[in-house]
């Protein structure tokens, strides 16, 4: 998975402000957003995660619209993709870049299905040559989104490169939306983000070093129950529940009661 993240930059290079406010109000809801979230195309297991991931509030906060070209970086199994696809299929465009599960690849291949005309950009290490869709927007995307991936880039040593690539991917005035597991600010920064948590100040610094400006931050994905001191890191919590079998009886109830991790939700603008 980590190897697939470096080539994202090659794709981003091909795609061609408001002052920072502490907690801005979300933009008006696109008409089709709630319909996409409530739609029958979604996996029932994914719906169960809405209580922790707040897709309606999160995407509204980022200011998504149906007519945008949106890049989702490292979509994985497509938790957000199955919302973004129906939302953008008529007037906009969805580009999925980086690692994607076989099931998500199959859904992209079915152009008549849930993801419609979505494009999956594939990469071929070690030369990272891009096999891209010639119809993709050359002047840049309206929005780049990434959900719970920054710790992987830190661990791989590619975080500055990826943020620089995301900056090049969006047009001036374009948006970068980031959701990430949030570290305890009282603890030292872990240079490898080994437990999956990242300091909010780190993410802001990475984005600003690439050229973005922080537009707003939201607490919509905050979880004050998360103590962030788990032996297996963030993966001890749902949905992974990576718990030592010898400790499972004791720790599983705690993990389930906590829910998913405490997360930062940050919106950046390209000047």
Give the positions of each predicted feature.
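Conserved class I S-adenosyl-L-methionine
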Residues: 66-76
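Class I SAM-dependent methyltransferase Rossmann-like catalytic core
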Residues: 33-61, 65
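Conserved beta-strand signature within the Rossmann-like core of class I S-adenosyl-L-methionine
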Residues: 173-181
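A short acidic, Gly/Pro-enriched loop at the edge of an enzyme's catalytic core
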Residues: 131-144
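A short, conserved alpha-helix within the catalytic core of class I
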Residues: 130, 152-165
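Class I SAM-dependent methyltransferase SAM/SAH-binding core
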Residues: 74-133
């Amino acid at each position: 998975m980590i190897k697939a993240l470096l080539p994202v930059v090659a794709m981003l290079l091909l795609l061609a402000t408001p002052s920072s406010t502490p907690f801005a109000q979300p933009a008006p809801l696109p008409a089709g957003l709630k319909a996409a979230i409530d739609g029958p195309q979604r996996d029932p297991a994914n719906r169960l995660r809405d209580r922790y991931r707040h897709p309606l509030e999160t995407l509204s906060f980022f200011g998504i619209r149906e007519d945008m070209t949106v890049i989702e970086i490292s979509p994985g199994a497509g938790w957000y993709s199955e919302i973004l696809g129906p939302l953008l299929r008529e007037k906009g465009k969805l580009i999925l870049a980086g690692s994607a599960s076989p099931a998500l690849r199959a859904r992209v291949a079915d152009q008549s299905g849930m993801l419609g005309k979505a494009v999956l950009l594939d990469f071929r290490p070690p030369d990272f040559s891009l096999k891209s869709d010639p119809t993709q927007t050359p002047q840049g995307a309206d929005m780049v989104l990434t959900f719970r991936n920054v710790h992987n880039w830190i661990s791989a040593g590619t975080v500055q490169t990826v943020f620089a690539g995301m900056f090049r991917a969006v047009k001036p005035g374009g948006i970068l939306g980031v959701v990430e597991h949030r570290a305890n600010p009282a603890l030292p920064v872990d240079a490898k983000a080994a437990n999956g948590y990242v300091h909010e100040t780190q993410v802001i610094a990475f984005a600003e070093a690439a050229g973005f400006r922080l537009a707003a931050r939201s607490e919509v994905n905050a979880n004050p129950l998360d103590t962030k001191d788990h032996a297996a890191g963030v993966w001890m919590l749902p949905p992974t529940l990576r718990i030592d079998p010898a400790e499972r009886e004791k720790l599983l109830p705690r993990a389930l009661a906590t829910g998913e991790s405490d997360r930062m939700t940050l919106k950046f603008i390209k000047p």
